[in-house]
Amino acid sequence: MFPLRAQSASLGANSTLFFRAYAVSHRKSGSKIQAWKGLKRGANGANRANGTNSSQPESQSSKAVFQSGKFSQLHQPSKKVYEKSSSGLDSISTFEQLRIFPTVRAAMVAEIKSTYNMKGPRYQSKDELVLKPTPIQVAAIRKINQPRLKNNKNVKEEEVSAGRKSAPSTADLVNEEFKKINSLQKLKVFTLAAETGSGKTWAYLSSLLSKLKEDEFGLYESSEEKYRASRNAQMVKSVVLVPTHDLVEQVYSTLERANSIKFDVEKIGANSRLKEFLQLPEQNGSLNLSILKWGSGEAHKKLFDRCLKGRVDVLVTTPGKLASLSKLQNVNRPYRFLNHVEYCVLDEADTLMDESWIETTMPVIEKFKKLRDLIICSATIPKRFQTTLNRIFPTDDSIINIVTPSLHKLPKQIKVSVIDSELSPYHGSKTRALAQALYAITRDGTEPGLVKRVIVFVNKKESVNSLVDTLVNKFSHRPEDVIGITGEDKPEERSEKLEPFIKPAESIEEDPLNSKIKVLVTSDLMARGVNFVGIKNVIIMDIPHNSVDLVHRIGRTGRMNQSGRVILIVDKKKNKAWLSGLPNAVKRGIQMG
């Protein structure tokens, strides 16, 4: 085998038994949604999952939190969770120090460089870039890529059933199923939480792709016949679930770029047996994984036909698409290709596990009877999301929590300012304040020679088109320079509108429309997960309803340690006193509550 950094593993549960308990909890409650409402009973066990002491206030887990009443909806992990996740971060400074399959590492680094927004004269080309893994990448890869223990003697099955004297609660049932199966080592459950723009996608993709390649190499070592049979098997090996079709496209595009990157096996350090494997025709030169996206408007036949041709290594889709398979009445066993899914990622999990999604998400995961790793990934931990996690995974041996020291902190490289539209020269007009801000951005001397790009957030989709019309008709912006996106746009329309904002800024000379500025007006639809590459300017026209949405909106800029600025426009209705303290909180690196 290739040299790897081995770590000890903490084990999770078996999906079949767990989701059986999930179904029991539904029947007991009489309502599906009631089972996930985060009831307070059993809270002490839930707190153990997060390392908190139920007798102490939650605020003791962090030094300083910027919060304001009901607006603050972010959960603060305990000091214990932070310490476990942060241990050894400073000792890792290169991707070579992490347990990543060699060809996956080569493809990952090349893909990250290919999308990097070059700035300043320091580097002449992207080949000169020296990339370092981000804290979430270090923490996640070290935990998720730990080799599985062959024997786990920490939990004995007789210990699980011993001492029961009364009827167990729903939480006890779920917890018991986890404990029972720990000795069988079937499933490990991870949560990843890190600040926006911190490299979470590659934190889980590098782990996922490494596991797929390690599995292939393991089969090849045991039997070339088994290896060939596995490649031809009619099955899906792993699934990445995201809440929107825009994110389906984004994750799929990242995978496809990495999958197509060429590399020289001779330059990849490997022992003779691994090198022999990498020189196989189907392994040599690129990752050559079978990657499938199943998005909006695509028929079930696309999934079925692809699986019939052989193994799908990674399926990128939404829970809704997979749930739709249950409605097929003319197809025999529509979920049969998913019976052997071993790895599943829930990206933007706080959305996928909220009350409006969980009845779709959980039954889908229940179909993955052979699941080994479940990775639950999010940029924020809303309090309601944490309550849901506590109910599903109530003890510290049922889940592995991974967070970064900067979770819920807004990046210091973002400059935040507040404009009071009640003051002169705006005289109560927020749109006039917006127009003035856009005018100033075009003339501020930043990004010389490049098309400036600005994202403007409003609270209601009805406000999107009216604001676009106002900027065009009243403030003389060119129609081609101001774009509105709402949920009513078709996926292909959204993709076309997003194009200028999800790729590096073009030079003014190269822009086909000769634009100096492009403005995207949208709602929270575009605030989560979308990787706006190199966006420097975000304007929040309407203050969001809670701190969770504020963090996500601000997080569309300042990604991957690049600079950005955020302008909040307020009026007498929304000029909350605490807003004036936000810029200083960002400078000081204080967590949002």
UniProtKB/Swiss-Prot annotation:
<feature type="compositionally biased region" description="Low complexity">
    <location>
        <begin position="42"/>
        <end position="51"/>
    </location>
</feature>
<dbReference type="GO" id="GO:0005524">
    <property type="term" value="F:ATP binding"/>
</dbReference>
<dbReference type="GO" id="GO:0005739">
    <property type="term" value="C:mitochondrion"/>
</dbReference>
<keyword id="KW-0067">ATP-binding</keyword>
<keyword id="KW-0809">Transit peptide</keyword>
<dbReference type="InterPro" id="IPR001650">
    <property type="entry name" value="Helicase_C-like"/>
</dbReference>
<dbReference type="GO" id="GO:0003724">
    <property type="term" value="F:RNA helicase activity"/>
</dbReference>
<feature type="short sequence motif" description="Q motif">
    <location>
        <begin position="130"/>
        <end position="137"/>
    </location>
</feature>
<dbReference type="GO" id="GO:0003723">
    <property type="term" value="F:RNA binding"/>
</dbReference>
<keyword id="KW-0694">RNA-binding</keyword>
<dbReference type="InterPro" id="IPR027417">
    <property type="entry name" value="P-loop_NTPase"/>
</dbReference>
<keyword id="KW-0496">Mitochondrion</keyword>
<feature type="region of interest" description="Disordered">
    <location>
        <begin position="42"/>
        <end position="63"/>
    </location>
</feature>
<dbReference type="InterPro" id="IPR014001">
    <property type="entry name" value="Helicase_ATP-bd"/>
</dbReference>
<feature type="transit peptide" description="Mitochondrion">
    <location>
        <begin position="1"/>
        <end position="106"/>
    </location>
</feature>
<dbReference type="GO" id="GO:0016887">
    <property type="term" value="F:ATP hydrolysis activity"/>
</dbReference>
<feature type="domain" description="Helicase C-terminal">
    <location>
        <begin position="433"/>
        <end position="593"/>
    </location>
</feature>
<keyword id="KW-0378">Hydrolase</keyword>
<dbReference type="Pfam" id="PF00270">
    <property type="entry name" value="DEAD"/>
</dbReference>
<keyword id="KW-0347">Helicase</keyword>
<protein>
    <recommendedName>
        <fullName>ATP-dependent RNA helicase MRH4, mitochondrial</fullName>
        <ecNumber>3.6.4.13</ecNumber>
    </recommendedName>
</protein>
<feature type="compositionally biased region" description="Polar residues">
    <location>
        <begin position="52"/>
        <end position="63"/>
    </location>
</feature>
<feature type="short sequence motif" description="DEAD box">
    <location>
        <begin position="347"/>
        <end position="350"/>
    </location>
</feature>
<dbReference type="Pfam" id="PF00271">
    <property type="entry name" value="Helicase_C"/>
</dbReference>
<feature type="domain" description="Helicase ATP-binding">
    <location>
        <begin position="181"/>
        <end position="399"/>
    </location>
</feature>
<dbReference type="InterPro" id="IPR011545">
    <property type="entry name" value="DEAD/DEAH_box_helicase_dom"/>
</dbReference>
<comment type="function">
    <text>ATP-binding RNA helicase involved in mitochondrial RNA metabolism. Required for maintenance of mitochondrial DNA.</text>
</comment>
<comment type="similarity">
    <text>Belongs to the DEAD box helicase family. MRH4 subfamily.</text>
</comment>
<feature type="binding site">
    <location>
        <begin position="194"/>
        <end position="201"/>
    </location>
    <ligand>
        <name>ATP</name>
    </ligand>
</feature>
<keyword id="KW-0547">Nucleotide-binding</keyword>
